[in-house]
């Protein structure tokens, strides 16, 4: 019998949301994504102690640079076992500073360049703030492809498409979490607000011939993944990938390019900020996500500092 994971791979590019090399090898995704939380977990593993030491020794006491060096080292190892791309995230504390985001992104891609990794195998992850989207627009023009993350609203998706970013990561599970907590309803199937959000974005992009890739992220259960089968890409935790690999039920394609979508839109900065202000869920989850990634970045810096002493 064919597993649901193998069925999914027929119409969706499967991406592993992990820094676990062993899991990546066994599950054989096309790409992999990392973030500060996953890097912190990897840094806490004794098996990566040498990688941490090397990252710090080459940073000349600059903790921020050491973190970037460690992130790139993890990315290099991942690229040894995936045929496609790895996403490496910029420090979330820079999410509201366009120039700083560009500078840090260029440093990260420079580290990959030095390691001999082709730029077409790396995506730079930025939070989908207005400043992050503007930074991505500039980076894309300079040949550095981006992954806009922490995406919770249609306004963010519209702005990302207009900016010509390579890929967006709408967060299915975190949208679901907010609405479940807000309403007390346990949404299932096509009624799931996270599923509805990604479906709307996907249909809008395809109807208007945007090339930006839609990669659903942050899944809480298999049903959410199944409802988005056919999406360009889905980045999935190792736990859920294993469940898909063990399930031999039938998986139907839910999303396809021919589905109807809304007319093309564009947003000025003030319109973007107003739309964001009017969307309580998106405002709260974006702020929460940036804070969480920033705290994990700080913990990673503390861990690196402790390792060197």
UniProtKB/Swiss-Prot annotation:
It is an enzyme of class 2 (transferase). One of its GO terms (molecular function) is transaldolase activity. It catalyses: D-sedoheptulose 7-phosphate + D-glyceraldehyde 3-phosphate = D-erythrose 4-phosphate + beta-D-fructose 6-phosphate. Its EC number is 2.2.1.2. Its main location: cytoplasm. It is found in: Cytoplasm. One of its GO terms (cellular component) is cytosol. Keywords: Cytoplasm, Pentose shunt, Schiff base, Transferase. SUPFAM superfamilies: Aldolase. InterPro entries: Aldolase_TIM, TAL/FSA, Transaldolase_1, Transaldolase_AS. GO terms for biological process: carbohydrate metabolic process; pentose-phosphate shunt. Pathway: Carbohydrate degradation; pentose phosphate pathway; D-glyceraldehyde 3-phosphate and beta-D-fructose 6-phosphate from D-ribose 5-phosphate and D-xylulose 5-phosphate (non-oxidative stage): step 2/3. The keyword Membrane does not apply. The active site is at residue 125. It holds the Pfam family TAL_FSA. The keyword Cytoplasm applies. Belongs to the transaldolase family. Type 1 subfamily. Homodimer. Transaldolase is important for the balance of metabolites in the pentose-phosphate pathway. This is Transaldolase. It comes from Pseudomonas syringae pv. tomato (strain ATCC BAA-871 / DC3000).
């Amino acid at each position: 019998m064919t597993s649901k994971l193998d069925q999914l791979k027929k119409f969706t590019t499967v991406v592993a949301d992990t820094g676990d090399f062993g899991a990546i090898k066994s599950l054989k995704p096309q790409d992999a994504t990392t973030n500060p939380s996953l890097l912190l977990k990897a840094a806490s593993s004794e098996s990566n102690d040498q990688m941490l030491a090397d990252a710090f020794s080459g940073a000349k006491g600059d903790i921020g640079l050491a973190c970037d060096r460690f992130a790139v080292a993890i990315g290099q190892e991942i690229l040894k076992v995936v045929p496609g791309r790895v996403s490496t995230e910029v420090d979330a504390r820079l999410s509201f500073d366009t120039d700083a985001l560009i500078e840090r992104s260029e440093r990260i891609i420079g580290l990959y360049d030095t390691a001999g990794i082709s730029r077409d195998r790396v995506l730079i992850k930025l939070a989908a703030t207005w400043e992050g989207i503007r930074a991505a627009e500039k980076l894309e023009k300079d040949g550095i492809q981006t992954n806009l993350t922490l995406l919770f609203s249609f306004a963010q998706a519209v702005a990302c498409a207009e900016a010509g970013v390579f890929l967006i990561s709408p967060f299915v599970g975190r949208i679901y979490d907010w609405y479940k907590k807000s309403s007390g309803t346990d949404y299932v199937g096509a009624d799931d607000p996270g599923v509805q959000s990604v479906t709307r974005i996907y249909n809008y992009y395809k109807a208007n011939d945007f090339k930006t890739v839609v990669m659903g992220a942050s899944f809480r259960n298999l049903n959410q993944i199944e409802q988005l089968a056919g999406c360009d890409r889905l980045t999935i935790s190792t736990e859920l990938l294993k469940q898909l690999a063990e399930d031999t039920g039938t998986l139907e394609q839910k999303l396809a390019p021919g589905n109807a979508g809304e007319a093309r839109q564009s947003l000025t900065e003030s319109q973007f900020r107003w739309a964001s202000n009017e969307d309580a869920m998106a405002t709260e989850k974006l702020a929460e996500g940036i804070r969480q990634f920033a705290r994990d970045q700080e913990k990673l810096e503390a861990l690196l500092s402790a390792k060197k002493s």
